[in-house]
């Protein structure tokens, strides 16, 4: 059953966030990096299902969706098919007219989420190379539009005491919702930014235990609910963005058989009917990518 899709329109980004798979891949394997933006014709040929009322999450794993060269054409085509769009972006380096064109395509069912972790004077401690001036322009245009708007804020040690100030700034700009998004992605690249324990995501302890023991009490994956079918910027299907991460991708059947899951030569219907895909979904607890990223934890 298909409830929606998570689509990485491009792996292009202007930022260099320490915890990002893009940053870490380029630092470790610069000779292997290539910029990709999903082919529009391939994308919509692959999506051979009814998109009316389905949620399409445009959120980058390696890149920021707003940097796809044909971004407006893509979102217009999704809206023409009745999809509900959820756009997640940092929002840097786009003009007022670009944002006005964006919101003219969206409607009241759609959401634009800005990822800004801190105040204008400190959020670039993590969002390296981001630009507050252009972000604020985008926020103000979106805030005045008919679509929903959100500010997503990850607590770090440099900003965990600024949450209420940021919440007030959010209200002042007119963004409708302020979300504190506690991260569990702490490792040698990001430990220097780790906040106090109360500001860390609830999966963190389970992930650390898994790293040392590879044992879990079960998995609770969103993809099993048909909500996270993922399409990569270079045009391949995986069950979710976690399984597209280079640290797990080539351990999965989707990374081992990339051509088999190319959106250029397949449809979502054929991929989901494939025995290998079905076997993967039927044995999620056996896969390292699921064990690490989606451990079953007590709800807080």
Name the predicted role of every residue range:
Residues 1-5, 23, 236-300:
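Flexible mid-to-C-terminal extensions adjoining Fe-S/redox cofactors in radical SAM and related proteins
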Residues 1-111, 125-133, 137, 144, ...:
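Conserved alpha-helical substructure of the radical SAM core
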Residues 2, 6, 39-43, 71, ...:
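A structural signal for well-ordered alpha-helical scaffolds and beta->alpha junctions
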Residues 4, 8, 51-59, 79-88, ...:
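Conserved C-terminal portion of the radical SAM core fold
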Residues 10, 14, 220, 287, ...:
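Residues immediately within or flanking Cys/His clusters that coordinate Zn2+
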Residues 12-14, 23-27, 63-64, 92-94, ...:
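Short, solvent-exposed loop/turn segments at secondary-structure junctions
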Residues 222-226:
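Short, small/polar residue-rich loop motifs at catalytic or cofactor-binding pockets
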């Amino acid at each position: 059953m298909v409830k929606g899709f998570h689509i990485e329109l491009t792996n292009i980004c202007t930022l260099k966030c320490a915890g990002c798979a893009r940053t870490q891949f380029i630092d470790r394997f610069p000779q292997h990096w290539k910029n990709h933006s999903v082919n529009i014709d391939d994308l919509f040929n692959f999506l051979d299902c009814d998109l009316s009322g389905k949620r399409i999450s445009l959120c980058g794993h390696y890149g920021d969706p707003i940097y796809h060269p044909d971004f407006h054409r893509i979102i217009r085509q999704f809206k023409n098919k009745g999809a509900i769009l959820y756009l997640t972006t940092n929002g840097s380096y786009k003009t007022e007219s670009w944002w006005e064109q964006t919101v003219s395509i969206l409607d009241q069912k759609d959401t634009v989420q800005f990822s800004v972790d801190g105040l204008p004077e400190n959020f670039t401690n993590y969002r390296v190379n981001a630009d507050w001036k252009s972000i604020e322009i985008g926020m103000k245009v979106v805030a005045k539009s008919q679509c929903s708007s959100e500010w997503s804020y990850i607590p770090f040690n440099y900003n965990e005491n600024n949450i209420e100030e940021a919440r007030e700034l959010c209200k002042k700009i007119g963004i409708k919702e302020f979300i504190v998004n506690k991260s569990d992605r702490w490792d040698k690249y990001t430990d220097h930014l780790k906040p106090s324990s109360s500001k860390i995501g609830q999966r963190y302890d389970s992930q650390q235990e898994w790293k040392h023991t590879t044992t879990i009490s079960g998995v609770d994956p969103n993809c099993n609910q048909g909500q996270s079918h993922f399409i990569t910027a270079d045009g391949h299907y995986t069950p979710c963005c976690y399984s597209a991460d280079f640290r797990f991708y080539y351990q999965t059947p989707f990374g081992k058989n990339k051509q088999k899951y190319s959106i250029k030569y397949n449809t979502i219907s054929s991929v989901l009917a494939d025995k290998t895909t079905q076997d993967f979904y039927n044995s999620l607890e056996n896969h390292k990518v699921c064990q690490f990223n989606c451990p079953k934890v007590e709800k807080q």
